[in-house]
A protein has these predicted regions:
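Hydrophobic, well-ordered beta-alpha structural blocks that scaffold small-molecule cofactor pockets
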Residues: 1-42
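Short glycine/serine/threonine-rich phosphate/pyrophosphate-binding segments
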Residues: 22-24, 63-64, 113
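Short, ordered loop/turn segments at secondary-structure junctions
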Residues: 41-43, 82-86, 107-108
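Short amphipathic alpha-helix with an adjacent loop that forms part of the alpha/beta core around
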Residues: 43-50
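Short basic, glycine-rich beta-strand/loop surfaces that mediate nucleic-acid
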Residues: 52-59, 88-109
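ADP-ribose/adenylate-binding Rossmann-like module
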Residues: 53-54, 64-91
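An accessory alpha-helical subdomain
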Residues: 108-167
Length: 167
């Protein structure tokens, strides 16, 4: 697996499915700032062709397989919730603290383990990290504006975290 963090601003994302599974996926996407297009049933090829990424949740496996095959043929990356062989990518367990994004993934093998790791991270990185990240970001910007090298900036960031007892 290759972990990527995508900026959702220019991403064309679709969501197909039914019921609570689709609703949960819609909520996850919205929380990430993704404006996913809710697709009608049946999904026409022209709507699929306009997408870059398709999420499928709450469909029977046969329907999901057919939709995934059609989408892939049009160059769309596909994630079918809980059907590993139909996924081009996986969504990790996510912990957000403002702009701080911590994730855990098992490549789709053991989602319960990824969830447990996320819960452990949540205990280690509480809500205070939202403010800490802003403080570190401001300090980093200052050091960069002073002309420090990337290595020096990195060292200063580490020293500040240690001095503040954050890590």
């Amino acid at each position: 697996m290759l972990p990527l963090v995508l900026n959702p601003v220019n991403l064309k994302v679709g969501l197909a499915g039914r019921g609570p599974a689709r609703d949960r996926r819609a909520a996850l996407l919205a929380e990430a700032g993704v404006e996913a297009r809710l697709l009608p049933e049946p999904v026409p090829d022209d709507l699929l062709a306009a997408l870059q990424v398709l999420f499928v949740a709450g469909l029977p496996e046969g329907e999901a397989r057919d939709l995934a095959t059609r989408a892939r043929a049009l160059g769309v990356l596909v994630n079918v919730e809980d059907v590993l062989p139909l996924c081009d990518f996986h969504v990790p367990a996510i912990l957000r603290r403002g702009d701080l994004l911590l994730t855990a993934s098992t490549g789709g093998q053991v989602p319960g383990l990824a969830r447990a790791l996320r819960e452990s991270l949540a205990e280690q990185f509480g809500p205070e990290w939202t403010v800490r990240l802003k403080e570190l970001g401001a300090a980093r910007a200052k050091w960069r504006s002073e002309g420090l090298s990337p290595g020096e900036v990195s060292q200063h960031v580490r020293e500040l975290m240690v001095r503040m007892g954050w890590l």
